Design a protein with these regions (language model features):
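Multi-pass membrane proteins that catalyze or facilitate reactions on polyprenyl-/lipid-phosphate substrates
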Residues: 1-265
């Protein structure tokens, strides 16, 4: 199979899975294994296509991101979504990521640990659906600092491969009385700085595996993940309010079974 086709397939996988509660890491490892695309070059490629997904969110939410530069609501203590909400949502994961980055990359990016993350994340999502209470926040402007911090703490779970950033944060939002749409949008926004920092750090360590010959493949993967991520996010927001998290949780368990059969055994 040609590199361009592999790039296209993995770009679709990344675009679909990055912001859905199904674990992009688990999917990329499984599909990469089935395609025979593994090793340091594959890891570097994954970093590049993650940047495509990040760009999709930056464009979709550019107005909201620009509004965060306005410090008036913060100074005047208005009940309006502001940069401090994002800080509270990002800070715990940044600390966890910096402290555990090398350990995670060295010991936790293993097939069996990803299976554990897939199942554990599914259990959390089902628990959040069962225990969720009537929402008190129906938009980002309704979000309290306490709810933002709660979601940020749940994002720490996503440093474990296979757990899923979206699954962790949306579950945390439901348990903190935030509705599906608001929890999802906040999840996307706080993912941006964390992902930019993590992918930037990884890219600094992996740039030596890049070569001029890789540019066409990496470009196809980047563009594909960008387009698919934009479509996936818009569709997911509409779908989540109708079906909730449980179908995604059941899919994760199914994926864990596939992972065990095709990668571990």
């Amino acid at each position: 199979m040609s590199d361009i086709i592999i790039a296209f397939i993995l770009g679709i996988v990344e675009g679909l899975a990055e912001f859905l509660p199904i674990s992009s890491t688990g999917h990329l490892i499984l599909v990469g294994h089935l395609l025979g695309f593994e090793g340091e070059r594959a890891k570097t490629f994954e970093i590049v296509i993650q940047l495509g997904a990040i760009l999709a969110i930056a464009i979709l939410y550019h107005k909201r991101l620009v509004s965060l530069c306005n410090i008036k609501p913060l100074i005047q203590k208005e009940k309006k979504f502001n940069a401090f909400h994002v800080f509270l949502g990002v800070f715990p994961a940044v600390v966890a990521g910096l402290l555990l980055h090398d350990i995670i990359k060295t010991y936790l990016f293993q097939p069996y640990t990803v299976v554990i993350g897939l199942v554990a994340g599914a259990i959390l999502m089902i628990f959040a659906e069962v225990k969720k209470k009537e929402a008190a926040a129906y938009s980002l402007d309704d979000l309290t600092y306490r709810q933002a911090l709660t979601i940020g703490l749940f994002q720490c779970l996503a440093v474990y491969p296979g757990f899923s950033r979206a699954g962790s944060t949306i579950s945390g939002g439901l348990l903190a009385k935030v509705n599906y749409k608001t929890a999802s949008e906040f999840s996307f926004l706080i993912a941006l700085p964390v992902m930019i920092g993590a992918t930037g750090l990884d890219l600094l360590k992996s740039w030596k595996y890049l070569s001029v010959d890789d540019i066409p493949m990496f470009a196809v993967g980047f563009i594909t993940s960008f387009i698919v991520a934009m479509l996936a996010v818009v569709t997911f927001l509409k779908l989540l309010e109708k079906i909730g998290l449980k179908p995604f949780a059941y899919y994760r368990i199914f994926l864990a079974i596939l992972f065990t059969l095709f990668v571990l055994l």
